[in-house]
Amino acid sequence: MTKTESKQLEVLRFIHERVQDKGYPPTVREICEAVNLSSTSTVHGHLARLEKKGLLQKDPTKPRAIELTPAGLTAIGATPQKIPVLGVVTAGVPILAVEEATDYFPLPPSLQTEQDLFMLTIRGESMINAGILDGDEVIIRKQSTADNGDIVIAMTAEDEATCKRFFKEADHYRLQPENDTFEPIILNEVSILGKVVGLYRDRM
């Protein structure tokens, strides 16, 4: 291992430890001080190379939004937590829910501290205005309640599951699609399976 590669592993470990400890990644200056680098530009160079290697990923829309990929976690000897993929749920006409794990998905580091998570594959286009597309996989936190406006996985009285935005109104519940071509689902009773807290899209 070269000196540069060794330093990059130090950077990865520090980012991972900070996210585990604080719940958010360090600043570039904090990385600089923690791994004894001479300048922030050197840190930026390491981060760019780590991202190119597929060991780190950044969200360009958010400041400091950097996290280790599953490959990055493997590189530092950390085992990524995995969550069950429980099949398909519809963003359209409700379909029967089947709670059997079809696969296990490595959890993004930003959600490693979360409990009781599972994943479902979306079928349909009723949530496209919320950025949830056909074929996307959504990460759901198990919970039986929701606030107005939350995107949830809900069960209807017929034991059918659907992904919609939740609203409790005067004498009913409204499961609102995010696509103007779909009608809302109005129910007297609804069972919440969980709240959508993340999304994964295969870009291949």
From Swiss-Prot:
User: Which keywords describe this protein according to UniProt?
Assistant: Autocatalytic cleavage, DNA damage, DNA repair, DNA replication, DNA-binding, Hydrolase, Repressor, SOS response, Transcription, Transcription regulation
Q: Name the catalytic site residues.
A: S126, K164
List site positions: Cleavage. A91, G92
Family in the record: Belongs to the peptidase S24 family.
* HAMAP family given in the database record: LexA
Task of the protein: Represses a number of genes involved in the response to DNA damage (SOS response), including recA and lexA. In the presence of single-stranded DNA, RecA interacts with LexA causing an autocatalytic cleavage which disrupts the DNA-binding part of LexA, leading to derepression of the SOS regulon and eventually DNA repair.
Protein name, entry field: LexA repressor
Q: Which gene encodes it?
A: lexA
